[in-house]
Amino acid sequence: MMRDMTKGAPLGHLFLYAVPLLLGNWLQLAYNAVDSIIAGRFIGQDALAAEGVAGPVMNLVILAISGLCIGAGVLMSEAFGAKRTARLKETLATTLLFGAGLCCAAAALGCALTPWILRALAVPDSIFGITGIYLRITFLGAPFTFFYNALAAGLKSVGDSKTPLKFLAFSAVLNAVLDLILIGGLGFGIVCSAVTTVVAEAASALLAAVYVARRVPELCPGHGQWCIRRDLLGPILRYGAVTAVQQAVQPICKVLIQGQVNALGVGAIAAFNAVTRVDDFAFTPEQSIATAITTYIAQNRGAGQTARIRRGFAVGLRLELGYWLLMGSLTLLLRRGILSLFVAGEGAADVIALGSTYLGCMAVFYALPALTNGFQGFYRGMGKMTTTLIGTCIQAGLRAAAAAVLAPRMGLPGIAFACAFGWCVMLAFEVPYYFWTCREWKLPKASPSGLRPQARVEAQPPEAALSAETEAGSGPVR
């Protein structure tokens, strides 16, 4: 169901939009864990190692795909808010056609370069062959992953976050069932695991395509609209490239921090592996709320409803902080019990003690990424992708540097304080720039009056705003 966020109370829009995103992210986290369990238990250590090697490689492909789709999603949200249905359809068509060609080329190139990739990663000879087959099959599934993500971005841009969740749930269940039957029951190997993943991705893409074609005529391109519009492709690529680079920064930072943790010993490594699972469940909802903020602001910016933007952003920040209070309290109260689920046996008490100290600090610090994610959602909705990249680079760089200084002196809690330091400096950059952006765009202050309908102002076409600014999408709606 489409959701027009240019009218009505922001709280209802943001909450109802964010919940399906949150459930989808949790479902993905749970599925990844189940997939690894099935591979490890039914196929063996080599299969689990092959998946582990292929994972980071495919993550780079997924980063590029998601970056392109997020960029297109912001432009589609603007068009939907401005009631420019033709522009909405043309943006989706351009994204699908260009992305399909790009993904097919990337899949072919990836398959051809697989041996060189594995040698560069120093993959052991014992799993070289099986990892190569697994990676090639996974590469072939990239176009299906793109189609689903692009269509899901289109649905989310018109305020429908429930339908993509249904398709994701179907895909996850189908994949798990096929794995259990073909791998657990019939004894097929790791190749079957890769094939079932591709089949599930193809099924979700097909369901999304049929749904858009039959149920969402406002989004489905017509016969004459299936072409690549150069004036739309430029903004999509600029938005998407910056977003993809931004998403790549965090994994690099995690690798650097993992190196500091590794120097602390096996107990610290085990504890950090456990606490990062808790971190994922803390950060994911905050990111879901940020995505809701992005869609809300992009729709209202496209509609020229500037009086609603700051009001909706303020409500979004309250939701972020409300979730932090809930998650922080639960983490403080239950951290030892949660950690005991991940470790057992000899040395478990030491691991739980280390992890508990870390989580005690992070329970308080989770408020900081709640705020930074909220501001990131605001900037994405305003089209300021470069600003989000700068903020992320500041946070990741200082976090890694602080970890190198604090971890040897403080142990695992030093990692927590390094994270807090990076988030604080990120806020020191984002908050002043927020007020500058509000003045630049002449955004009225947040107040209940912002909920009343105002005269609709015709928004600039995305390409017009982009051509006038050095930063993608940084020009105000006139």
Segments from the language model and where they lie:
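Small-residue-rich hydrophobic transmembrane alpha-helices
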Residues: 48-108, 145-164, 271-335, 369-383, ...
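Residue-level signal for short hydrophobic patches within transmembrane helices
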Residues: 11-30, 34, 57-64, 140, ...
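Hydrophobic transmembrane alpha-helices of multi-pass small-molecule transporters
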Residues: 60-63, 107, 175-180, 204-209, ...
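Transmembrane alpha-helix boundary and packing residues in multipass membrane permease domains
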Residues: 21, 25, 37, 74, ...
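Helix-terminus/linker motif at the lipid-water interface of multi-pass membrane proteins
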Residues: 30-49, 118-125, 181-188, 248-277, ...
